[in-house]
Amino acid sequence: MGKKSGSSSSWLTAVKRAFRSPTKKEHNNNAHGNEVDEDEDKKKEKRRWLFRKSTNHDSPVKTSGVGKDAPAQKSTETTTIINPTVLSSVTEQRYDASTPPATVSAASETHPPSTTKELPNLTRRTYTAREDYAAVVIQTGFRGYLARRALRALKGLVKLQALVRGHNVRKQAKMTLRCMQALVRVQSRVLDQRKRLSHDGSRKSAFSDTQSVLESRYLQEISDRRSMSREGSSIAEDWDDRPHTIEEVKAMLQQRRDNALRRESNNSISQAFSHQVRRTRGSYSTGDEYEEERPKWLDRWMASKPWDKRASTDQRVPPVYKTVEIDTSQPYLTRGNSRTGASPSRSQRPSSPSRTSHHYQQHNFSSATPSPAKSRPIQIRSASPRIQRDDRSAYNYTSNTPSLRSNYSFTARSGYSVCTTTTTATNAALPNYMAITESAKARIRSQSAPRQRPSTPEKERISSARKRLSFPVPPLPQQMDGQSLRSPSFKSIGGSQLGALEQQSNYSSCCTESLGGGGEISPASTSDYRRWLR
């Protein structure tokens, strides 16, 4: 047993020496020229050592001290033999573990020991600082390359994400801004429409308030009547149909009282508002509205005064306008058979402002026409509102109005009368607008000598003026009542025409032609009328 254990240990040591001794010699001889081969040998040695270490642990036999010394000597002796065949022996020992160690030990015993001083150098580590530095540099470079590649990939990924996210963010921001802009536009349009509607409503409300108030009042009255009828019919019906408690009856009565009070308050408010609207409209009215109110006041005043058809009633009313009557004589008329009759037909007007009198004085004239059967001195009247009351005697003249029968008076419905101002009187007290014009003088001359008048251009001018100045006057309904005119009767006028004049005469001419060829009376010209009216 002891021999076997010694032989096994010697075989192991011999293998170690055979594997390490030539590498050390080569290292010393080549001066570190074959470092790569040495590294490979070291790797192989490590692998073999690990393999043999496991086998050594499996063997339970231990060598003694003597056995250790002997295999050491034998290994030194056999180095020369095993040196050329190191690799082959290593491979054989590595893959063929069944070879007996006796042959190796015998070979080692036959050769003497040569190198015993190289044993400590076999266990020395051959790693140097240069190799460590080279490994660190290689690892650092490789790791830096990997880090740079990862960083480059990360940067590209971040850029791609930023690009995509930025595009999405910009798109979302644009969409948000567009939505906000559309919302602002809609709000502005709605606001403008509301302003326009409120302005139009406020402008139209001023014109439609009165109508709406009236309509509301009318509808309110209708609803009140219906509610009253319903209440009158429903009290008994409800009371008869189903029983009510005292609280319900009180509540019903209180509700009806509240509704009645509410209706009264609404009516009072609507009335006050309508009065206010009328008051404001009245403040904006002009003089035309004042002119429209005056006929109403005149109608009321005229209706309050009873008028008589006789002259005595006319004389009791103080005249506002003075009447100037001038007699003109014609050679073919006689005074003996004429009857003297005063024609006090004057315009009865209330004492009103000068504006009112001036507005209506152009429609008030007195008519006096001669009779074609018995021509009498012609009665000419001229009314002027500017003549004072105390000068009445200076301008009051009486004339004889011809008539076939007794004088009679008829009431004319229209408030117009004919005014003629053709006179031959040379009164110095007459104003300028009462002066006789050339056309009036020519007309008087033509009437004085009807048989001897030549055919001159004046005749044509007179006839044209006669046609021009015979114009119809529109009626005034406000002034139709209370006017009494005295006019001579005509044989040629029918009863129907007189009846029409008694009821309502819509027209009155400034000049009336006689049917029998008598004298004709007409105003001088329209300019004289205008000056007279002013």
Curated annotation (Swiss-Prot):
Record lineage: Eukaryota, Viridiplantae, Streptophyta, Embryophyta, Tracheophyta
Domain of life according to the entry: Eukaryota
IQ domain ranges (all copies): 131-159, 160-182
Stated name of the protein: Protein IQ-DOMAIN 17
Job description of the protein: May be involved in cooperative interactions with calmodulins or calmodulin-like proteins. Recruits calmodulin proteins to microtubules, thus being a potential scaffold in cellular signaling and trafficking. May associate with nucleic acids and regulate gene expression at the transcriptional or post-transcriptional level.
Family: Belongs to the IQD family.
Alphabetized PANTHER family for the sequence: IQ-DOMAIN 5-RELATED, PROTEIN IQ-DOMAIN 17
Cited InterPro entries: DUF4005, IQ_motif_EF-hand-BS
PROSITE patterns attached to this UniProt entry: IQ
Organism: Arabidopsis thaliana
Pfam family, one: DUF4005
Compositionally biased tracts (Polar residues): 1-12, 73-92, 111-123, 326-342, 362-372, 395-406, 445-455, 480-490
Subunit structure: Binds to multiple calmodulin (CaM) in the presence of Ca(2+) and CaM-like proteins.
Localization terms from the record: Cytoplasm, Cytoskeleton; Cell membrane
Entries under Gene3D superfamilies matching the protein: 1.20.5.190
